[in-house]
């Protein structure tokens, strides 16, 4: 009977490590990397947008709800997801 009780305790406690205090699934690096790759496929990640930066003549925005109306300041930039920092622009050089 002791083995059965121990097995039940382990089965009840083990799933708790996959959730944080708020009941949300804990996000690991591999999930955010997958999201970043998803955002950068095809034309999902960028589009031409209205420029809202004074003195700038160019910008790109994310097409996803998560990025909203964010514009990158230079050409060649793409919207990427940085784990724990959220979405932002990734610009060459």
UniProtKB/Swiss-Prot annotation:
GO terms for cellular component: extracellular region; host cell postsynaptic membrane. The keyword Endoplasmic reticulum does not apply. GO terms for molecular function: acetylcholine receptor inhibitor activity; ion channel regulator activity; toxin activity. The modification 4-hydroxyproline is found at residue 54. Keywords: Acetylcholine receptor inhibiting toxin, Disulfide bond, Gamma-carboxyglutamic acid, Hydroxylation, Ion channel impairing toxin, Neurotoxin, Postsynaptic neurotoxin, Secreted, Signal, Toxin. Expressed by the venom duct. Residues 1-23 form the signal peptide. It comes from the Eukaryota. Transmembrane segments: none annotated. Disulfide bonds join 62-71, 67-79, 72-89, 77-91. The modification 4-carboxyglutamate is found at residue 48. Residues 24-45 form a propeptide. It is found in: Secreted. The cysteine framework is XX (C-CC-C-CC-C-C-C-C). Displays a mini-granulin fold, a structure composed of two short, stacked beta-hairpins connected by two parallel disulfide bonds. This newly described fold is derived from the same cysteine connectivity as knottins (ICK fold). The name 'mini-granulin fold' comes from the structural homology with the N-terminal region of the human granulin. Hetero-, homo- or pseudo-homodimer (identical sequence, different post-translational modifications). Heterodimer of [carboxyGlu-48, hydroxyPro-54]Ms20.1 and [carboxy'Glu-50', hydroxy'Pro-56']Ms20.4 may exist. Belongs to the conotoxin D superfamily. Alpha-conotoxins act on postsynaptic membranes, they bind to the nicotinic acetylcholine receptors (nAChR) and thus inhibit them. Through its two C-terminal domains, this homodimeric protein would bind to two nAChR allosteric sites, located outside the nAChR C-loop of the principal binding face and at the adjacent binding interface in a clockwise direction. This toxin specifically blocks mammalian neuronal nAChR of the alpha-7/CHRNA7, alpha-3-beta-2/CHRNA3-CHRNB2 and alpha-4-beta-2/CHRNA4-CHRNB2 subtypes. This is Alpha-conotoxin-like Ms20.1.
